[in-house]
Amino acid sequence: AVLSSVGILIFAHYIGDATDLTLSERRDAFKGVLIFTSVFVAAIGILVFFFLDKNGEPDTSTDVSQVFVWSDFMKVMNMPSVWYLTMIVFCAYMGYKVTDIFSLYAKEVMLYDEISAAGIGSILLYLRPLVGVIIGLLADRTQGSFLILLAFIMMFLGSIFFASGIINPGLNSLFFIGITLSAVGIYALRALYFSILKEGLIPVTLTGTAVGVISFIAYTPDIFSGPIIGYLLDSAPGGAGYRSVFSLLAVFSLLGLVATWAFRKSVSSIHQ
């Protein structure tokens, strides 16, 4: 979040108050941000190289408990809660990928300038850890799956705000309500979904295998979400493309709600 804020300041320094920049001027401004980011990352690498503890000897012994066991894998594959949780994470991660376009929406639909639009993305980066801490505290006092239900409802309401087309230039209050609902719901899901492994009655000894199976499937939006979102935006330029993207997000919100409800029902039936 701090790094993004500094990047915005550098970008603003290069473009100043100009609103009609040439491609060359925009390239120079972006180059300044890239140089800063590259230097920062290189500096971190140098610090890690010199100050990371090198005295610890690597453990070359093989612990039998760490060896992949096919029977454990099959146990995980036969757990309904694992598949419900996979769907929950999949839908939540689709929501997370959509947060990448909020800044673009601010620029192309709300007609913000480049600096203000980038600032939206920076605000979201500050919001993410704040939501994570608050949701973590709440999760200690109630069932995580209940909070996930609420988070999917928030994600759905936020996506409907954008998909309905009621958010137009000048309606900043509606824009921020839509962003807040969507982002809080999405970031809450990111903080919660693996916290319900215990609630799903997945044994601690199988946690690693379960997380591996869930992650292998549920994080596949990294592969196809970008092309899908890009296609929807390109096929209908302007607000129509964004309405299509947020309509898709609404669908995944409902699927996540159904998966969470099924997860809770499955767990409660086992308890009975």
Predicted regions and their residues:
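A late C-terminal transmembrane helix in Major Facilitator Superfamily
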Residues: 201-237
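A membrane-interface helix-boundary motif in multi-pass transporters
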Residues: 16-38, 231-253
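C-terminal transmembrane helical hairpin of 12-TM major facilitator-type secondary transporters
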Residues: 143-196
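C-terminal membrane-cytosol helix-exit motif in multi-pass small-molecule transporters
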Residues: 7-12, 16, 38-59, 259-263
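Extracytoplasmic gate region of multi-pass secondary transporters
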Residues: 8, 80-125, 129-132, 190, ...
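Glycine-rich segments within core transmembrane alpha-helices of 12-TM secondary carriers
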Residues: 1-12, 215-225
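Juxtamembrane intracellular "pre-TM" segments in multi-pass secondary transporters
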Residues: 55-85
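Helix-to-loop junctions at the C-terminal end of transmembrane segments
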Residues: 131-143, 233-234
